[in-house]
Regions:
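Long, ordered, helix-rich scaffold segments
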Residues: 749, 766-774, 778, 782-783, ...
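C-terminal, well-structured subdomains that either form a transmembrane helix-short loop-helix hairpin
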Residues: 481-486, 492-501, 505, 650-680, ...
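Active/binding-pocket-proximal capping segment
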Residues: 680-696, 701-708
Length: 819
């Protein structure tokens, strides 16, 4: 049992990943009375459990069955020869290519009565008349663009198009947009600006609301606010009086969302302007990246579950971040000319700060003292000239941290006795292949802003090689033909919104760059080629073993249209010549839980009857890849209806790469055998690994691991260390590390809520992490919930949750295995 003190900490600061209570913003955005919002203090009770619920999709095409009826896209006439296919720049091209290309995407499973009358892409100036000169109010026009549904049907606020049925790309050309009132987003909304000249949303001096943008869809709870994005814009409150309370953005959202390349411009010397909040409902977000904050009282005011903050800068902001949560990582951030960088008083689990700089700060980090393992702090390569860490108001550390500084429980291999450190320096011997200079390599999501329109190829517009993306036509052959013919180093393959049905492997050759309409461009597997569990077949195969070059994929979704026990969704073999040449950004996996997949309707009860996919992502031994903002989700609830979801996806993320692998802001949830598996892997850097165990596993489950999977791979755990009937031991591992070396894992968390979709008393699961036969393994900032053993070395228990009570259950500041 946890002590009352620990229980209070857990109650105060931990947020359930699928809590669905909606906290409305107060009704109409046109009523000033509705805009008074008070931040909630998120104190869920210890015994609270998520209550998954469906979202209505009342205008869905009920007859759409891609798993049954398919026609093959024809080749209508001779295609370009490969030597003629090299793309060239348009001599008269100017401006951002995304604004100029043909947008012929669709919502594939919308009722045909409405489908042709629904536009995914909306240019707020050309299509809705928004003023971008800064002279007239643009809020109403932008709001109309956000809200518009099919011209003959309901609008996007009507709660009638599910989660996946109402994708909307709201494009803002360059300019200044005067805002007299706020914008409200809905599920499936992505706001995109011109990265060559980012548009500015500038609040007027008489701005009426308390936020410029509300990202959270008010119809639903924060933890089911998926598929939202904002990128390439500036939000500006400098025209609002410094003495008026205003927040630029409410970002109370969860996984499969993206906030990147956004600037927050606020007046200096204000006590009331806040850049970003996440305080208006429970939320489970993964990553915020490549942002800047100028001025303001507070840059980000957070209450949530977990995050990694990557490449974020704060200049002249009084307090950079108020960080309320359990597992928080700062990576490559910069704080300058402020009073306090990170207020971690509310970080109940672990705060991990990596490759970060403070310049002209009063204090870089302030935290609370704790009598438990909670409030752990890890600093790794931090530069600061003044007070670096204050705990309980007292300066604990000043100046630079050249290596790694640990405050909290520290373990070494083969030793079940932790050291309680109040500030211990240890050595983390970083692999040079993972670095840019002294820092871990990172890069911003590519916008390809240097590309001309002539260098972008709409995959649906290639003469003679039709691709439909309509959720019913088999596009396999023609996608492969196009990717093969255009495998040059200069072409960008654009997949408009829609579902691309494939019946065999799509091969992505070296030289390929793919970009979709975020969360709306989906590749979906179906057919007998993916049915054999004993011989898994990749839906997407990126390069062959030994290939070296460029292969980049952004803004795509990968899924299955049927129960396919032999489907490995993505396999990567190619290695990058330079870091970032091979990568995935804002690309996600979804198994079940959505329109267009028979898994949604079939997999409602017994996991033995629903081996929906062999696994999600396999980074093979020859691969070298950079992955940022990726959620590997096997559905626990229905996004587009009310079907229960009891699905068995065999595996989450398997890493065997040895050259260099980066995983930044990733989540892997509800997969059967494991969420993350590092098998003979070397030279791996991670910043934030978030996971949940399948809700149907545990005491009372009809399937105890490795059941229902009969054909185990050599990399799979066999659970032979568990008694045959030990249901809590035979649950999915959060992380398995075997035969690996030089792994640098910052910020890992595993949350367990259920046994057999019902209540579990006390600990719900026995084991979280298993490490064996490895060297130079560094785990910093590890968090668990409702798990007995946090770390095993083979069969030996090293760290228990009871010994490391804090956060949402257990917290380990550092674990060094043979390091």
């Amino acid at each position: 049992m946890r002590s009352p003190t620990v229980s209070v900490l857990v109650t105060i600061l931990c947020i359930f990943s699928l809590q669905v209570w909606a906290v409305p913003h107060g009704g109409s955005r046109n009523s000033s009375a509705s805009r008074v919002m008070s931040p909630l203090q998120h104190f869920p009770p210890i015994n609270y459990q998520p209550k998954p619920s469906g979202i209505p999709y009342t205008i869905k095409n009920q007859s759409a069955q891609p798993w049954l009826y398919r026609t093959t896209a024809p080749i209508t006439h001779s295609a370009l020869a490969e030597e003629d296919s090299v793309c060239t720049s348009s001599s008269n091209s100017s401006g951002y290519w995304y604004e100029q290309i043909d947008h012929n995407g669709q919502s594939s499973f919308m009722d045909s009565k409405y489908k042709d009358n629904y536009n995914v892409f909306r240019n707020v100036v050309k299509d809705f008349g928004a003023d971008n000169t800064g002279q007239k109010d643009a809020a109403a026009a932008i709001s109309a663009a956000i809200k518009a549904g099919p011209s003959n049907g309901p609008d996007r606020s009507s709660n009638s198009m599910g989660t996946t049925g109402q994708p909307a790309i709201i494009y803002l050309p360059a300019g200044t947009y005067l805002m007299k009132s706020s914008l409200q987003l809905y599920l499936g909304t992505v706001i995109i600006g011109d990265p060559t000249n980012p548009p500015v949303l500038k609040a007027s001096s008489d701005f009426a609301d308390d936020h410029i943008i509300y990202a959270k869809d008010p119809n639903f709870g924060g933890t089911i606010n998926f598929y939202l994005g904002i990128k390439n814009i500036i939000i500006d409150s400098t025209g609002v009086g410094a003495d008026k309370s205003i927040t630029l953005l409410d970002w109370t959202v969860s996984q499969a969302t993206q906030l990147t390349n956004v600037g927050f411009n606020m007046p200096t010397n204000t006590a009331k302007h806040v850049g970003l909040t996440t305080q208006y409902d429970y939320n489970s977000n993964l990553i915020l990246n490549d942002l800047w904050f100028k001025g303001g009282a507070t840059g980000m005011k957070l209450s949530g579950q977990q995050w990694v903050f990557k490449n974020i800068s704060f200049s002249g902001t009084t307090t950079g971040v108020v960080a309320g949560g359990t597992d928080i990582v700062f990576l490559g951030c910069r704080f300058e000319q402020g009073t306090l960088g990170i207020d971690a008083q509310g970080t109940s689990g672990s705060l991990t700060v990596v490759d970060t700089t403070g310049v002209g700060m009063g204090t870089l980090i302030s935290s609370s003292s704790s009598n438990t393992a909670g409030n752990s702090i890890v600093l790794d390569n931090v530069q600061n000239s003044g007070a670096t860490v204050k705990i309980g108001g007292q300066t604990t550390l000043s100046g630079n941290v050249a290596n790694t500084w640990v405050h909290g429980h520290l373990y070494t291999s083969n030793n079940a006795k932790f050291q309680s450190q109040q500030g211990q320096t240890v050595t983390t011997s970083r692999s040079s292949s993972l670095l840019s200079g002294k820092n871990y390599f990172t890069m911003a999501p590519p916008t390809y802003k240097e590309y001309s329109t002539g260098q972008v190829l709409n995959i649906k517009n290639v003469p003679g090689i039709p691709v439909y993306g309509d959720g019913e036509t088999d596009d396999t052959r023609n996608i492969n033909l196009i990717l093969s013919r255009y495998k040059t180093s200069c072409s960008l393959m654009y997949f408009p919104a829609g579902t691309y049905i494939v019946t065999d492997t799509i091969f992505v050759p070296a030289g390929t760059r793919i970009i979709g309409d975020a969360y709306a461009s989906t590749i979906s597997a179906v057919g007998s080629n993916f049915e054999d569990e004993s011989a898994p077949r990749a839906m997407i195969l990126v390069g062959y073993p030994g290939d070296v070059g460029v292969a980049q994929i952004s803004d795509m979704v990968f899924t299955v249209a049927d129960v396919l026990p032999g489907c490995k969704l993505v396999e990567v073999n190619i290695a990058a010549r330079s870091p970032g040449d091979v990568g995935f950004w804002n690309s996600h996996f979804r198994i079940g839980g959505a329109a267009g997949s028979q898994v949604e309707s079939l997999c409602t009860d017994d996991p033995n009857d629903c081996k929906a996919a062999w696994g999600l992502l396999h980074l093979t031994s020859t691969s070298s890849a950079y992955i940022e903002n990726m959620w590997g989700w096997t559905a626990d609830h229905d996004l587009d209806g009310d079907n229960p979801q009891t699905i068995s996806t065999g595996r989450g993320l398997l890493v065997e790469g040895t050259a260099a692998t980066w995983l930044i802001g990733t989540g892997s949830e509800h997969n059967t055998l494991y969420q993350y598996n590092f098998q003979y892997a070397r030279n791996v850097f991670t910043a934030m690994q978030q996971s949940e165990t399948p809700y149907w596993q545990g005491a009372g489950s009809r399937a105890l691991n490795p059941t229902p999977w009969q054909y185990l791979d050599s990399s799979d755990p066999d659970f032979s260390n568990c008694a045959a009937n030990d249901s809590k031991c035979r649950m999915a591992l959060f992380e398995r590390i075997y035969g690996s070396s030089d792994l640098f894992l910052y910020g890992g968390c595993n949350w367990v809520f259920f046994n057999n979709n019902g209540d579990c008393s006390g600990d719900c699961q026995t084991n979280a992490i298993d490490i064996a036969n490895s060297t130079s393994i560094y785990l910093y900032g590890t968090n668990t919930k409702s798990t007995t053993n946090m770390i095993l070395e083979g069969t030996k228990v090293i760290a228990t949750q009871n010994d490391n009570a804090g956060g949402w259950g257990g917290v380990i500041a550092g674990y060094l295995y043979d390091s």
